[in-house]
């Protein structure tokens, strides 16, 4: 190609190719992870080879594998935030129909994006501390957003803030468990998929029904007795 032609090429074409290479590296890391490797066990050379680029191209996008992992967390969770935002909007008052539709929609999304959710589930307890912290931060974000929504609707609007946050945490961890169960499914197991989905729906119903009957004054946990203090037992 003529050098002058290259110089006249619109800059957006170069940017587009750069974005394509970056995405190829992210997809390569997800694929290698699915083949059984955690992020900490995958080398950047393996990622570059899987993406079809030379290793030096990796450094044009990421300093190291930790930075690639952080980009993956951002990329996956950015898409997930929109799904959860829509679910929160429809389930603000936790009607039964909204719980069912939200769970079924989430199940479909997980099964359509298994590699991404396998990455989040695996790296939540992975060896890379920066990535592990990023996943934990996203989980706290989802829980905090849900708590903010719940606070504006009864019965949660009358509950102490800590209790609302506890309900949100229960919901988020139920969804995390649902995700892990779905990822263990093999292909062609519709009955098991239905069982997992139905159980999650029932668990969320129980959480919201229980929260509606919650009395904060009855749920107080007394502090531990000071060392040497009488236990009150005979």
Give the positions of each predicted feature.
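N-terminal intrinsically disordered/low-complexity leader segments
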Residues: 1-20, 158, 215-234
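Generic hydrophobic, amphipathic alpha-helix propensity
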Residues: 17-29, 47, 72-80
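Helix-turn-helix
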Residues: 24, 35-67, 71
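Amphipathic alpha-helical packing segments from all-alpha helical-bundle domains
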Residues: 129-155, 165-180, 198, 202
């Amino acid at each position: 190609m003529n050098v002058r032609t290259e110089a006249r090429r619109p800059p957006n074409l170069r940017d587009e190719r750069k974005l394509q290479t970056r995405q190829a590296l992210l997809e390569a890391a997800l694929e290698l992870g699915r083949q059984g490797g955690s992020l900490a066990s995958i080398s950047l050379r393996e990622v570059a080879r899987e993406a079809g680029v030379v290793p030096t191209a990796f450094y044009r996008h990421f300093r190291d594998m930790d930075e690639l992992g952080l980009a993956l967390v951002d990329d996956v969770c950015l898409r997930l935030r929109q799904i959860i935002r829509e679910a929160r909007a429809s389930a603000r008052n936790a009607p039964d129909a909204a719980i069912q539709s939200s769970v079924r929609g989430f199940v479909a999304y997980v099964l359509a994006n298994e590699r991404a959710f396998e990455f989040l589930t695996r790296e939540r307890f992975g060896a890379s501390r920066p990535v592990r912290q990023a996943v934990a931060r996203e989980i706290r974000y989802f829980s905090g957003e849900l708590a903010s929504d719940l606070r504006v609707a009864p019965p949660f609007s009358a509950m102490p803030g800590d209790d609302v946050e506890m309900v949100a945490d229960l919901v988020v961890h139920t969804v995390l468990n649902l995700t892990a169960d779905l990822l263990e499914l093999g292909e062609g197991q519709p009955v098991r998929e239905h069982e997992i989905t139905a159980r999650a729906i029932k668990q969320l119903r129980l959480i919201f029904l229980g929260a509606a009957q919650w009395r904060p004054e009855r749920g107080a946990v007394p502090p531990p007795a000071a060392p040497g203090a009488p236990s009150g037992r005979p």
